[in-house]
Amino acid sequence: MSAIFPELPDSVSSEFVTVTEGVELRVLRAGSGDPVLFIPGWNYSAEVFVHQLTELAQHYEVLAVDPRGHGKSSKPLTGNNYPQRGSDLAALIEALGLKNLTLAGWSLGVLDALSYLRDHGHDRVAKLMLIDETPKMAADPGNPEEWGEVPLTHDGMPAFILFLSTDRDGFLSYISADALGVDPELADQDEATRRLIADGAQTPEHIAIIAGVEGFATDVSQTAIDFERSGKPVLFFAKEAWADDAKRWVSANLPSAQFATMPVHAGFMTEPAAFNARVREFIG
C-alpha cells in the first residue's frame, strides 16, 4: 500500500450525478461544512485527492469529481472538450446545491474550473484555487511576460503533440512519474507511480489525446484575471521547479492572489500535510 496514493477510506462516499443526457459524473464526498470541490488533471480520477478527502474533510465538506472521460464517469465519444466540461461542472454544482464554494483545479483541471467560471459565472463560487497550471499552456519562450508549459517553437508544441498522440502510454508514464518527483526511467519501480499510471489509464486514448491537445491550445487567462478583479480570493500553487516564473506571471496578472509553492506537480499527494495546512489557512 502506497502512503502517497493509498486506497480511499470508508469515510469517503461515492455517487453518480447526471449532468447531461447519457453522461454521469462520479463524485467523491466526505466531511461537512463549507464545500471544497477538487478537479483532477489530465486523465486522472478524483481519487488522487485521497489525502484531502480524509484530512481536509475534518474541517469542510470535501468533494472531488471524475470529469467526463475520467475514472468511473461516463466516457462518451463526443463532448470531450473544456467548454463542455465547464458546463458539466455547472450542472453538477447546481444538482448538488453547492454554494459558498471553494473551487480547486489541478493541472489541466484548471482549464475545467476556468471554463466553468467563464461560461457560467461565479455566483456560487466564493474562492478559487489554481494548482500548478497556467491558464494558458502555450507560451513564447522569448517573451518574458508569458509563462506556459508548452513552448511555442518548431520543436516545442509539435513534440508535445506527437509524443501524446503516438505514445499515449509513454506520455502517461512520463507525466505520472514527473508529477510525483520520480525519475521517469524508474516509473515501473515506484508503487505510487504505478498506481497513478493505472488511475490515468482509465481514460480512453481518444479522450486523452483530445483533452491534451485542446489543453495546449486553450487560453482562459482572462477568466482568471476577471475572477481576481472581482475581489474574491485566489490561491495559486506552483511547483518549486518553475515557481519563479509562475510567481512573476501571478504578480503581473493576479496581483491580489495568494501564492504558495509545493515540491512537485502533485505536491498535494507527496506532501499532503503542508498542502492541506495552506489550504486551511486560505479558506479559513
Features from the language model and the residues they span:
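Conserved alpha/beta-hydrolase catalytic His-Asp/Glu region
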Residues: 139-147, 161-227
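Short beta-strand immediately N-terminal to the catalytic nucleophile in serine-hydrolase-like folds
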Residues: 103-105, 131
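Conserved serine/cysteine hydrolase catalytic core
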Residues: 201-253, 258-262
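Conserved HGGG/HGGXW glycine-rich cap/lid loop of the alpha/beta-hydrolase fold
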Residues: 6, 19-78
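Catalytic active-site module of serine/aspartate enzymes centered on a nucleophile-bearing elbow/loop
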Residues: 254-284
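Conserved acidic catalytic loop of the alpha/beta-hydrolase fold
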Residues: 83-101
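Flexible "cap/lid" loop of the alpha/beta hydrolase fold
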Residues: 114-119, 124-167
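Gly/Ala-rich beta-loop-alpha elbow adjacent to hydrolase catalytic centers
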Residues: 105-109, 113
